């Protein structure tokens, strides 16, 4: 009986093991199926970024907007185009500081987006990439709407390709801005002044602001900490060189001619550069610019202005009033926006225009589709709605865009004055459009360094001018 019992125990044990193995195999199979399904789901979610080369999905990297409404407006444009075209878009927003770094990394790895829009790329990246032959020719996007652009806007994107020894449209204009002057109307009122008292003669204009500071510091309610002029002077901020480029324009110091040639060997140009450096550094030495302006980054003059530490400041966008748009009392009644005065020789000021641009890389995997999207985006009605979402921080690059009454509302003096500056006054782009070597002049902050050499190292304006000229000539030689 014991032998019989052992026999059946062995059978049962063997059967149990087989059963366990069988069901374990089934369980394993089911687990693999579940994992595979989950993996397929995850793959579908990430295929936009991981399968660019095998799909028609367009990758767009776009500068994150100053306001959330800007980003939402672009998302809607993308969604509308996806519906009408049947194509898909992977849209990524990056900050102003991160996007250039991300782009630099992508250029080294070859993992490029199909379309890029970066506010800083205009003068730090695009002219160099066009020169190196790394951008797609976008003439087909420009051609149908070419007559709608102003000459200055077209000039900004008509760039030189050193590889092909010719110029072409290697970028598409999206919006433009120039440099404005913002001031506190209520601070002027404290010293019995208003906008009608501000003169248009160059020297008298700046003397006016000096007197405002002196009266605010010595009036019935003295403010010993206030400065009249929030002018950036550091060798780190793009606001510094943008403002100084406008000062050079005021003094008619043409650094690069229309053929792209340096003019720095001309004594009259050297003298005008020295005059410009002497003018701006004298304002600081006289105590009308905050001491820490030598260290300011791009946001610092905005902060000092909004905190009422300065009476007025130049700024290359309308971001200062835009930041106060929700406070109607501040926006409409306390903050003001001004044009620059006439040039020192009495001529009307010509404004330097910054044109923000979108590009398609030559090695982009979906070039044709990216250009189709750009052609959709630059339709005047589409682009205008996008710009209006930014509450007028930037302005149209096309003539039909200006016809929208949004830009001509006289009750909004910030936008109305900016519109006048960009549509009724002479304008020109930065010098990089004439010669891409000038991008390096801006990147190296040559003018900010010259200002700091005068103020920190007691160099004369003449010697600082010669140092700046020597470095600029070196840069241009390297680009030949």
Language model regions located:
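Hinge/lid segment of periplasmic solute-binding proteins
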Residues: 120-180, 221-225, 240-243, 251, ...
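Extracytoplasmic/periplasmic solute-binding protein
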Residues: 160-174, 179, 204-263, 310
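Conserved N-terminal structural module of periplasmic/extracytoplasmic solute-binding proteins
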Residues: 1-8, 12, 16, 23-132, ...
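Conserved C-terminal helix/tail region of periplasmic/extracytoplasmic solute-binding proteins
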Residues: 52, 88-89, 189, 282, ...
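C-terminal lobe and pocket-closing loops
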Residues: 318-331, 343-446
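Short helix-initiation/N-cap motifs at beta->coil->alpha
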Residues: 93-102, 200-204, 292-306
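Short, solvent-exposed loop/beta-turn-alpha elements that line the ligand-binding surface or hinge
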Residues: 137-152, 198, 221, 231-235, ...
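Glycine-centered hinge/linker elements that transmit conformational signals in sensory
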Residues: 208-213, 259-294, 336, 340
